[in-house]
Amino acid sequence: MPDVRRAAAPRARSADPIAEEAAELLGSGAVPAMNAAVSPSVAAGREMMDRAMRIVPARSELRVTNEAGFVLHAHPYRETSLVLDVFTRDHGRVAMVAKGAKRPHSALRAVLQHFHPIALSWTGRGEVKTLTKAEYVGGMLPLSGDALLSGFYLNELLLRFCPREDAHPTLFRHYMATLTRLSHGEPASFVLRSFERVLLQETGFAVAFDQCLRSGERVQPGLDYVYQPERGVRRTHASDPSSWPVVSGQTLLDMAQDDYSRAQTVSQSRALMRFLLHYYLQGAPLKTRQILIDLQYL
C-alpha cells in the first residue's frame, strides 16, 4: 500500500491566523490516517496542523480560478465562516476557508452544497486555502432519499483514500458520472461497486481485476481466484486465509466491465469489495457504509 503522507518539512507559523485556526479545526475532525501508529484522530490532527502551518519560501502564492469541484465536507468555523474539504478536477482534495459563508445573505450559502457542481476560485500557499469565489455550474439532478445517502458514502471514501492536493482527473470524472447514475435511479449496489473499484485503482491500492498479476494471464471465467492484498488477482491456493473471499473468474471479468447483471457477480463483488476496503482502511469503520449495509444496499 502506498504511503500517502508527505515528507516532513521545517515548520513556520502561518501568515494567515484564520487559515491557521481553520487548519486546527479541520485537523480535529479529519479522517484517521490509514497507517497511523498513534491514535488515528490525534495523528491526523498533528499531520494536518504541521502541513497547514508550513510555508515554502520559494513558492509564490497560489491562485486558482474557475476550477471544477464539489464540496465533500464542511465544518462550521467561527460565527460566519466554513472550513471546506472540496474535491477538484485538477488539484484533487483541497481544504479552504469560506469566509462569511454562514451569513444570512451570503451568496455562498446556496452554492456550497453537497453534490452541487461548482466553479471554485481560491488563493493561498499553505495547506488551507482561502476561497475567493464559488459559482454553481448546474447540469446535474439533485440527490434525494437513498441516492443521497449513497452520495455521502462516496464522499467518505474520497476523504479516506485521497491525499490532499493529489489530482485524480479520471476519478473526478467517475465521481460525476456516479452522481449522475444515482440521480437517475440506477441500483445503488451496482453503481457503488463500480466507484469502489475505480477508486482503489486510481489511488494505487488495487490493480486490474481481469488479469493475474504475476503470470500476466487473463482471468478465465470458469476458474476460481482470490485478490491478494498488495499483489492482485491470482488462482486460489489451499493455504489461502479463510478471510479471503473466493470469487469466480466470471465475476472479476464482469467487475472489470461494470456488468452486474449476474446474481453471482452481485454477491461476490460485494464480498470482495468489503474485504478490500476493510483491509486498506485497517479495519477503520466507514459510518455511511454501515448504514447502507443495514439498509441492504451494500
From Swiss-Prot:
One of its GO terms (biological process) is double-strand break repair. Disulfide bonds: none annotated. Keywords: DNA damage, DNA recombination, DNA repair. The keyword rRNA processing does not apply. Gene3D superfamilies: Nucleic acid-binding proteins, Recombination protein O, C-terminal domain. The keyword DNA repair applies. GO terms for cellular component: bacterial nucleoid. Pfam families: RecO_C, RecO_N. Signal peptide: none annotated. Belongs to the RecO family. Involved in DNA repair and RecF pathway recombination. PANTHER family: DNA REPAIR PROTEIN RECO. This is DNA repair protein RecO. It comes from Cupriavidus metallidurans (strain ATCC 43123 / DSM 2839 / NBRC 102507 / CH34) (Ralstonia metallidurans). The gene is recO.
